[in-house]
């Protein structure tokens, strides 16, 4: 059974720009991992009339509503009262919820504030959703054919309750049937139209749906299948996709480009040193965001000025004067210099013009050179990227990681 699901997030801070609404994205992602599709999402401030109107409207059109926020102990936490009024329930002190709140404080060896008792005032005939990580119990309210789940707005608490309390109930409501499954393959180096063109020439196996998404600079290939054989169908579809798009598929699911490069470096035992100019340390940051990066990353330096390139990397004055700091020759010398200085197996260097100023007719903004130095070979390549300064820097750093991935995977 396919469920028609909506998300409602509440709080002034979400609509006035004080905080980003990360809950909607996280809920949609978790639901998607179970095969459920969100049909609608809304964010509403702390306005009783607006929230009540939204709940009534959505409950008449949706099978499931997942609402977050407004379950705290302060006067502006209004969700339980609004839900009770919207669906003709009395607001009552729920002894089970109160016991949970008291137990939470007792386990923390803290005194419960009288205001926290307000969090146990819930609509009649609701099912309590225990909160292991905070004081605000959630609740499940059913009105006609709509199941409504009210969760706290604190992301950590909300995610835990969604996983432990809500998703199993959705699975039960859908008849225990295997929901739609989705597998996402991540592509770098091809545009969305190019990716789609590849599939038009080599269609997926029957029974697999295809969709695309873009998160600069990546394209996401979304493979979807239903039924008991969904896993096997997606395995076949993934193999097909990798064959059709090789070598541009760099990750699947929650994997990342930096994470896979880190894993490959760890598996091979190779060590790396980085020399960055236009990316200003972005490559180093991407890799050091991965736990255990010290096993393979020996050092990384931002050699922004010509003097730094000469002092730290031994780039010759002739190269800088004749070819320029943004050139194949300079990038190659930077890669050699950092590898020799660090004594590593690999040296990776990048130099370029991120803009908005600094471009010339011969070397416009977006000109970037990458170089890889190893004990056995030297590679250098020039690129012309488009976009604003941040986009050029970001795609340049990603291309550097992609270079490493292809080198380590023998995909050149």
From Swiss-Prot:
| Superkingdom in the source lineage | Bacteria
Pfam families cross-referenced by the UniProt entry: CinA, MoCF_biosynth
> Do you know which Gene3D superfamilies this protein is assigned to?
CinA-like, MoaB/Mog-like domain
CDD domains assigned: cinA
- UniProt family annotation: Belongs to the CinA family.
Q: Which PANTHER family match?
A: NICOTINAMIDE-NUCLEOTIDE AMIDOHYDROLASE PNCC (PTHR13939), NMN AMIDOHYDROLASE-LIKE PROTEIN YFAY (PTHR13939:SF0)
- What is the official name of this protein in its record? CinA-like protein
Q: What organism is this sequence from?
A: Syntrophotalea carbinolica (strain DSM 2380 / NBRC 103641 / GraBd1)
């Amino acid at each position: 059974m396919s469920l028609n699901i909506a998300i409602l997030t509440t709080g002034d801070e979400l609509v006035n720009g004080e905080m980003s609404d990360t809950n909607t994205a996280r809920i949609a992602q978790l639901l998607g991992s179970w095969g459920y599709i969100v049909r609608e999402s809304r964010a509403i401030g702390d306005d009783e009339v607006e929230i009540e109107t939204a709940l009534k409207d959505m409950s008449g059109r949706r099978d499931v509503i997942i609402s977050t926020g407004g379950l705290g102990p302060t006067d502006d936490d209004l969700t339980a009262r609004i839900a009770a009024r919207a669906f003709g329930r009395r607001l009552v002190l729920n002894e089970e919820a109160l016991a949970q709140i008291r137990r939470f404080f007792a386990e923390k060896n803290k005194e419960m504030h009288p205001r926290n008792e307000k969090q146990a005032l819930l609509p009649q005939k609701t099912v309590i959703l225990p909160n292991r990580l905070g004081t605000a119990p959630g609740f499940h309210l059913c009105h006609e054919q709509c199941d409504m789940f009210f969760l706290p707005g604190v992301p950590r608490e909300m995610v835990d309750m969604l996983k432990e309390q809500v998703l199993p109930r959705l699975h039960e409501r859908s008849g225990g049937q295997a929901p739609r499954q989705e597998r996402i393959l991540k592509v770098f180096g091809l545009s969305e139209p190019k990716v789609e063109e590849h599939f038009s020439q080599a269609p997926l196996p029957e029974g697999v749906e295809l969709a695309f998404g873009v998160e600069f600079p990546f394209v996401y290939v979304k493979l979807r299948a239903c039924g008991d054989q969904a896993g096997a169908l997606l395995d076949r579809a993934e193999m097909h996709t990798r064959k059709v798009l090789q070598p541009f598929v760099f990750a699947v699911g929650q994997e990342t480009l930096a994470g896979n490069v880190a894993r490959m470096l760890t598996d091979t035992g190779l060590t790396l040193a980085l020399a960055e100019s236009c990316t200003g340390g972005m490559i180093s940051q991407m890799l050091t965001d991965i736990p255990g990066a010290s096993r393979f990353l020996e050092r990384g330096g931002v050699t922004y000025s010509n003097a730094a390139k000469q002092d730290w990397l031994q780039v010759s004055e002739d190269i800088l004067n004749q070819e320029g700091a943004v050139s194949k020759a300079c990038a190659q010398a930077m890669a050699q210099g950092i590898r020799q200085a660090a004594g590593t197996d690999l040296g990776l260097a990048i130099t370029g013009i991120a803009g908005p100023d600094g471009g010339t007719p011969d070397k416009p903004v977006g000109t970037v050179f990458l170089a890889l130095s190893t004990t056995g070979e030297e590679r250098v390549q020039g690129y012309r990227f488009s976009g604003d300064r941040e986009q050029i820097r970001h795609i340049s750093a990603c291309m550097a990681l992609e270079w490493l991935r292809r080198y380590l995977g023998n995909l050149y």
